[in-house]
Amino acid sequence: MISIVADLESITKLESGELKINLVNFDLVRLTEEVFELAQMLANERGISLQFATKTEKPIMVSADKKRIMEVMNNLVGNGIKYGKKRGFVKVGFYDLHETILIEITDNGIGMDKNDLFRIFERFYRVDKSRSREQGGTGLGLSIVKHIIEAHDQTINVKSVPDKGTTFTFTLGKAK
């Protein structure tokens, strides 16, 4: 119940523009390692590997609200685990687009039908009601993710194929 109230409070502030974005420079690789550390136990329980899709030998510095981007990454990696297949994967890749970094989170889970893709960022929308009930959650996570990315003046995109998996992509500005 507390989680639902916190999610509703977050999304209300995001939608109204009340939530301020606190831009700081941070290492996206390190933040993703922290997300993987937090998610590892659940991933192990479900037989899902957490991987980097690109080389991460050096820091990738971005300018963004670190707390909010941690929330975005936790949500997207968590969903990849939650809706993943046994012996599946969640991969995070980073791609340099000159002034921005493209972040790509891919899983080989249950995927979504193209008709659902238009609605997944809506409040309380759940693709598969029976599976969602089994997995828990508030139905607010992807709506919050979208608002956080938009508050950074960026967009989030999704591609998915049923029974093949899902890929979310968004960009963040490089640290100056």
Residue ranges and their predicted role:
Residues R87-E99:
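Short beta-strand/loop element within the Bergerat-fold HATPase_c
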Residues S16-I21, P59-A64:
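Conserved micro-motifs of the catalytic ATP-binding
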Residues M112-R126, K146:
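Short conserved segment of the HATPase_c
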Residues N22-E37, Q51:
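A conserved beta-strand-to-alpha-helix junction within the catalytic ATP-binding
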